[in-house]
Amino acid sequence: MMIPELGRRPMHRGNEDSSFGDDYEKEIGVLLGEQQRRQVEADELERELNLYRSGSAPPTVDGSLSAAGGLFSGGGGASFLEFGGVNKGNGFGGDDEEFRKDPAYLSYYYANMKLNPRLPPPLMSREDLRVAQRLKGSNNVLGGVGDRRKVNDSRSLFSMPPGFEAGKPGASASEWDANGLIGLGLGGKQKSFADIFQADMGHPVVQQPSRPASRNTFDENVDSNNNLSPSASQGIGAPSPYCYAAVLGSSLSRNGTPDPQGIARVPSPCLTPIGSGRVSSNDKRNTSNQSPFNGVTSGLNESSDLVNALSGLNLSGTGGLDERGQAEQDVEKVRNYMFGLQDGHNEVNPHGFPNRSDQARGTASCRNSQMRGSQGSAYNSGSGVANPYQHHDSPNYYALNPAVASMMANQLGTNNYSPMYENASATLGYSAMDSRLHGGSFVSSGQNLSESRNIGRVGNRMMEGGTGHPSHLADPMYHQYARFSENADSFDLLNDPSMDRNYGNSYMNMLEIQRAYLGSQKSQYGLPYKSGSPNSHSYYGSPTFGSNMSYPGSPLAHHGMPNSLMSPYSPMRRGEVNMRYPAATRNYTGGVMGSWHMDASLDEGFGSSMLEEFKSNKTRGFELSEIAGHVVEFSSDQYGSRFIQQKLETATTDEKNMVYEEIMPKALALMTDVFGNYVIQKFFEHGLPPQRRELGEKLIDNVLPLSLQMYGCRVIQKAIEVVDLDQKIQMVKELDGHVMRCVRDQNGNHVVQKCIECVPEENIEFIISTFFGHVVTLSTHPYGCRVIQRVLEHCHNPDTQSKVMEEILSTVSMLTQDQYGNYVVQHVLEHGKPDERTVIIKELAGKIVQMSQQKFASNVVEKCLTFGGPEERELLVNEMLGTTDENEPLQAMMKDQFANYVVQKVLETCDDQQRELILTRIKVHLNALKKYTYGKHIVARVEKLVAAGERRMALQSLPQPLVA
């Protein structure tokens, strides 16, 4: 029998009495109880069917029909007779199409299709079934908000969820909306998603791709007409196609699993009010205000704004859909999003969550000098509430001078990309904020500075990511991180080649003239790529990351971290040849987005054509006069510097004058240059006397810093050698008070040594007196030991010599074994007085074997054998041979890695009598020495000496010829 339908009641009315809440709770309880009862009855009926059916018998149509009918009738739902119609040949009563499109049959078919394969297939696909199940799980038993549902205590377990109505075959989208199911049709006319896309393939594509495949395509896009026609506003507010929610409607957004792309952006868990965002394209066109400057503003008129605001507070459906299916309309919006470049303007919701409210969104058009709209945030979508975080500098309400329209074109970009499809490289390359966002890197001469300030305010708005929220985070580094993805799409547009060209700008025209001036010479010297980098025209598919494009800064380049390797203040970045910034962008502290092709100093970015010709031409002989105007540049080059040094040795007076005039203004810079310092040294040698003197004057007041510099110290040494005495004295005096610092410095110690060598002793007394009391300490220093040796060589003052030698001789044993002090002792043995050598040898006597086995002291013992007298040498040899016939000290020395060299030195320096004695002792142990690594050295030396002695003896035994 037909089950009577209860009256349809709305979920909420503004003037309901207080008893509605109690009725509502009772209704919920009845529904829950009925659902449990239906489940129990269904289980019992299934068991009964299994009892009357043989396990081996195939399923029959009648059995399936009775089972299904019993489920529908016994379960309290509408029986199969409800569908009416004549019994067809398939065994089912009622209209076949009406029967097969019912969601209850769909669920039954997929649950029992294996038991009865003769069941006719339903009209809905599995995909539609999953959608219905999602809606059922999301809506539970309450249905959609504002729908008209049937309240029936006898619903079947397999009936459609509350809120679904079996619509007529010709039901339009507006009829579905009346039932609260926006954009979802489950009847016989329902199309699958594949059908929708295939049907939509015939529609013309009106949008251009947002990512051109090449740079040429990109240039064509940016040069195209940027005027936004009213018909183009149809795509405004299209949702991001992150899931099927954008295709099926807002009901899918009620899924318990939120879209990960919208988690951080959804302001509250409330449902989007049905009907609040449903505005047809025609309505949008009718309600859009026209700008007085022929630009399209995104704001609706006041009455429409009021209607939208009030509709956002209403929970009932409001209608207002297009005539075509809502699913197809949503699919078109998906396509509009994916190809969202509309003549240079993208009107897609940048926040990427399924927003059903198409509230007004603004656009910054080059022809629209009134900047309204651009709410920048869809957080308050559908609520009709204004953004509470809007700050007073927001560009939404700025009326800019039309004269700055050309500035707005490249300053703001057009937001082509959504954060979902942004370029990762542009995001990572973002630093504090590009100078172009602060108001532009270049200001036309005819534009007022106040308008530039307005542009700066627009840039400040963009620095907040377009969200309207103030910078309330305490950590500036985190604030930068938070807005990386928000501004990545702007960066791609800011890296547009037209940004660098900026056609029509007077300042850029001037730079173009400068560039053309050197273009003929520098055209063949394109900006070099880093070694190993591919010569590609784009990066990650973005045409803005090709050659000669703006180069973004690093996110680590923070003004609070000047020592960061990626900071603009880092030595790494300062020393990078290719990273030179235009003058217009040098005053900004964060990441600088300077052009790779240098605008401010063109000469620094490219090598001179003269220098390149010199290095590439191996056959032509150049002269100094031919490089006039390029001397400094040649001096800083490896090959150019060598060329100048060679030519200065034989240069004429005119050539020397030419070189002198060019290097003098850059003399200090060349002195510290890796190649330029050699040119300065050579000019000190071969320059004219007046020129050398004037060049020496450049050193005054710079001696100390140059002495501590790697290349400057060489220039100071050469100057001390060749300049006049008065200049030498003046230069040396600058070291007073810094002597010990220079002595311990790896560069300064060479300057101190040169002062001791070239400056008279009476003029460097302040240097020598500094060493008194520190001779031993300096003798054990890697650089100080060299200075002490120069003092012993060039300071002949008896008082100075006695003081220095007294400290050395008092610690001979310690200095002899020191890795640096041993050089000082060797120097005394070689250049000292005989009595000083005798004191040292006597100090070492009795410890010769021990000292010979020590690495550093063995060198001192060798010097004692070399420079000692015969008596001193005999004393050392006797100690080595020992007092017994076994010669134990000699055997130990011959097998030692260091002492074996001392034994070899003895065989070289001793007289014949001592050599014969030593050889006799060594021959006894010759076979045993061959087994030791270091003993082999002694064996080889002995064999040579024996062979030489035998030859000498043979020559002596020959009869002497008679003299006539």
Swiss-Prot record:
Free-text comment about domains: The pumilio repeats mediate the association with RNA by packing together to form a right-handed superhelix that approximates a half donut. The number as well as the specific sequence of the repeats determine the specificity for target mRNAs.
Region (Disordered): 1-22, 204-235, 256-300, 343-388
Protein name: Pumilio homolog 3
Organism: Arabidopsis thaliana
Domain spans labelled PUM-HD: 606-946
Highest taxon of source: Eukaryota
Residue numbers bearing the Phosphothreonine modification: T257
Lineage per the UniProt record: Eukaryota, Viridiplantae, Streptophyta, Embryophyta, Tracheophyta
SMART domains with a match to the protein in the record: Pumilio
Residues bearing PTM Phosphoserine: S192
